[in-house]
Amino acid sequence: IPTEICRLFPKEDVIEVGYCSPTAFFHDVGEFDKERGGYYVDLSRKILIFLDQPHTMLLEHLRPMLSHDSKEITIKVTDKAEKHGMKTKNIFLLGYPSVVFCTAGMKIDEQEATRFLLLSPEIHQEKIREAIHEKIKRESDVTSYKSALSGNYDRFLLMQRIEAIKQAHITDIQISEEDAGELEKYFLEKVTSVKPRHQRDIGKVIGLVKVFALLNLWFRERMGATITANKEDIFNAYMLWDKISESQDLNLPPYVYNL
């Protein structure tokens, strides 16, 4: 699913990675900066997709970035030098990216579980039948299938909208004081007792509000590179979060929670 969705976005904004070691990832994605004496890795406004669960150490390195602790973080990694054994290297990581990783495994560290939205595809009978039908259509005639997909007008309009959002260069999305109060009231009403992880969960809800605002930026109050979310964005975020909040609270993907 992520690999298909990422095709809606400009190619230059998507980074797809299979397995790689933590050091290899930074070397491959980054560029050496002589002045700063380290590798500069610019992940800002990128979509980073790991096609399998990333190396544990790589996720550990990325945790401050995933938590939005700082726009730029410095990481020190060790690497084998040709003559002098192990050598420390500086990595300057610039965010923020949107990060997706796929795994069929059930063991996810709580550190990652609270930083990510845990999602799973629908697996009811009708959905599986549709998937089988699409698989047959695709494999029977790949060229015609891709041509039909490219010619889908709704898909084309969505891709154009995404490109237009990129070209708008929005740098900040605000929520009014009144709407922020409503957001807090809604969130606290949904939890019986607050936990430390809820500090990250409310961040996810706010992120959803901002996503809906960005998708409709032409119809939102705008001042320069800043837009303001409205009540419709908050309502849509509520509706989406309600569907997954209970499973997220238990660190479970919806599929497992609904068994």
What is the role of each PLM region?
Residues 1-131, 137-148:
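Conserved ASCE/P-loop NTPase catalytic core
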Residues 90-97, 104-259:
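Phosphate-sensing "switch" segment of ASCE/P-loop ATPases
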